[in-house]
A protein has these predicted regions:
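An amphipathic alpha-helix signature
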Residues: 8, 51, 90, 94, ...
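Hydrophobic/aromatic residues within well-ordered alpha-helical segments
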Residues: 46, 53, 57, 61, ...
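Short, Lys/Arg-enriched anionic-surface-contact patches
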Residues: 1-3
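Amphipathic alpha-helical packing segments from all-alpha helical-bundle domains
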Residues: 87, 101-111, 121-141
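Short alpha-helical scaffolding segments that buttress acidic/His motifs in well-ordered protein cores
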Residues: 96, 110-114
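Residues in soluble alpha-helical coiled-coils and helical-bundle/repeat scaffolds
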Residues: 44-48, 52, 101-105, 118, ...
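Helix-turn-helix
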Residues: 6, 10, 14-56
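Hydrophobic alpha-helical connector segments
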Residues: 52, 65-104
Length: 141
């Protein structure tokens, strides 16, 4: 794991437990085992680090959906699922829910969004899109 990946992983863990305001750059750097100034070589600010985590996790969700053949955006074609065998559809839905709740990154990301949704409109919107709307969308097939 690269230093940047360690920073992202550690920051996600701290932000998901303590919230944005509760986790300091110093705490993150200390947990990674680097100097605070070294963290700034990878991310220019705490905000950039937080936004980088959110962007990365959304990209991972999109990769999962698209890699599984699931629609990700509202404009994606859902007609592909008409006439799909029930067993295949059930397996697809179960795999999707396991991803949402069992994947370690996703579980921490969900907690981060839950904590941040009241102060960060973008986090609220992403939480609704991924953990409410997507679940309903997958069930609607």
């Amino acid at each position: 794991m690269t230093t940047k990946e360690k920073i992202l992983d550690t920051a996600l863990e701290l932000f998901s437990r303590q919230g944005y305001d509760g986790a300091s750059v110093r705490d993150i750097a200390r947990a990674v085992g680097i100097r605070e100034s070294s963290l700034y070589n990878h991310f220019p600010s705490k905000r950039a680090l937080f936004d980088g985590i959110v962007d990365f996790c959304v990209q991972q969700a999109e990769l999962y959906f698209r890699g599984s053949g699931l629609p990700f955006d509202q404009g994606d074609d859902t007609s592909l699922y008409q006439g799909i065998p029930a067993e295949r559809l059930h397996a697809l839905i179960e795999r999707t829910f396991r991803y949402f709740f069992d994947d370690p990154w996703n579980a921490r990301f969900r907690r981060l969004l839950l904590l941040s949704q009241f102060t960060e409109p973008r986090c609220r919107d992403i939480y609704r899109q991924l953990y409410r709307d997507k679940c309903v969308q997958v069930q609607a097939f």
